[in-house]
Amino acid sequence: MLELGIFSSNTQNIGQSISERFAGIFPSWPIMLATLVSFTILLVVLTKLIYKPVKKMMKNRRDFIQNNIDESTKQVEKSNELLEKSNIEILDAKIKANTIIKDAQILAEEIKNNSIKDAKDKSKQLLEETKIYIRQQKVLFAKESKKEIVEIAGEMTKKILSESDVKLEDSKFLENLLKNDITK
């Protein structure tokens, strides 16, 4: 039984110990009220001294970042517009350059054709002048040939006449006849 008595006193001690501990967990009302008031004061002070300045600083920083983002967006849009404008100007310049090249090629072709035409005209003119010169030389050669033939014929006639007894008048007649034939 003694054992039972020890067991029951231990149980009572344990029950009291647990009750004391639970009673120690809950503070007294005045301490709890003082803690609550001091926590509220601390919360108000921290809000005024730390939270509001930190919140204001964060808002300023957020506004600064947003302004930078907006500015960057505007700059990107502006640079895209300038890029598009420069691409259009480059395209216009290429079109103008191609037009200038085509015009230059057409002009060069015209100059080439005119030069070829002028050269052909000059060669035709030179050919005509050469033909005229050749005709003149032929006529001159024919006249000179006839003249030489007449002279040779005259000399031969004189020889023949001198060997024969034909009169001098007949020889003059032959010379006149040959000379008239040459002048025609």
UniProtKB/Swiss-Prot annotation:
<keyword id="KW-0813">Transport</keyword>
<comment type="function">
    <text>F(1)F(0) ATP synthase produces ATP from ADP in the presence of a proton or sodium gradient. F-type ATPases consist of two structural domains, F(1) containing the extramembraneous catalytic core and F(0) containing the membrane proton channel, linked together by a central stalk and a peripheral stalk. During catalysis, ATP synthesis in the catalytic domain of F(1) is coupled via a rotary mechanism of the central stalk subunits to proton translocation.</text>
</comment>
<keyword id="KW-0472">Membrane</keyword>
<dbReference type="GO" id="GO:0005886">
    <property type="term" value="C:plasma membrane"/>
</dbReference>
<protein>
    <recommendedName>
        <fullName>ATP synthase subunit b</fullName>
    </recommendedName>
</protein>
<dbReference type="GO" id="GO:0046961">
    <property type="term" value="F:proton-transporting ATPase activity, rotational mechanism"/>
</dbReference>
<keyword id="KW-0406">Ion transport</keyword>
<keyword id="KW-1003">Cell membrane</keyword>
<dbReference type="InterPro" id="IPR002146">
    <property type="entry name" value="ATP_synth_b/b'su_bac/chlpt"/>
</dbReference>
<feature type="transmembrane region" description="Helical">
    <location>
        <begin position="25"/>
        <end position="45"/>
    </location>
</feature>
<comment type="similarity">
    <text>Belongs to the ATPase B chain family.</text>
</comment>
<keyword id="KW-0375">Hydrogen ion transport</keyword>
<keyword id="KW-0812">Transmembrane</keyword>
<comment type="subunit">
    <text>F-type ATPases have 2 components, F(1) - the catalytic core - and F(0) - the membrane proton channel. F(1) has five subunits: alpha(3), beta(3), gamma(1), delta(1), epsilon(1). F(0) has three main subunits: a(1), b(2) and c(10-14). The alpha and beta chains form an alternating ring which encloses part of the gamma chain. F(1) is attached to F(0) by a central stalk formed by the gamma and epsilon chains, while a peripheral stalk is formed by the delta and b chains.</text>
</comment>
<dbReference type="GO" id="GO:0046933">
    <property type="term" value="F:proton-transporting ATP synthase activity, rotational mechanism"/>
</dbReference>
<keyword id="KW-0066">ATP synthesis</keyword>
<dbReference type="InterPro" id="IPR050059">
    <property type="entry name" value="ATP_synthase_B_chain"/>
</dbReference>
<dbReference type="Pfam" id="PF00430">
    <property type="entry name" value="ATP-synt_B"/>
</dbReference>
<keyword id="KW-0138">CF(0)</keyword>
<keyword id="KW-1133">Transmembrane helix</keyword>
<comment type="function">
    <text>Component of the F(0) channel, it forms part of the peripheral stalk, linking F(1) to F(0).</text>
</comment>
<dbReference type="GO" id="GO:0045259">
    <property type="term" value="C:proton-transporting ATP synthase complex"/>
</dbReference>
